Amino acid sequence: MGEETDRWQRHDWWGVVLDTDDVETLTRFYAALRGWRVHHLDETDGSLDPGEGVAYLNIQHNREYVRPAWPTQSGEQQMMLHLDFEATDLYSEVVRAVDLGAELCEHQPQENVRVLLDPSGHPFCLYVS
């Protein structure tokens, strides 16, 4: 097996980009929720480094951002994606997420999953496997 290349020197990074009208709030929310380092933050975008692998989460300012509806409603802004995060203790992770600024959704389609909305209204899930 060959020598591994430092993750910062690799050219196979990939990421997810979330639009928002409040870059700082959303960047700091996900940094606190996941314990990820804020790699970059200004008024136009924020970038989070999870610390291993080659994936990242980027938060991008969009002046025309509209919060998606959850659950989905005809004629309303649809969610484009949602993030899933595994939890060790679902109850305590939900409480922590709400304390950080998330909103627990009334509609919960699965027993071992909790759907929440981040401060910009993007649905995300906490789950136990």
Please provide the spans of the model-predicted regions.
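A detector for short, charged/polar N-terminal pre-domain segments
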Residues: 2-9, 69-70
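Core segments of cupin and vicinal oxygen chelate
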Residues: 7-61, 93-95, 99, 105-115
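Conserved, structured core segments of small domains
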Residues: 55-73
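Residue-level structural signal for beta-strand termini and adjacent loop
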Residues: 110, 127-129
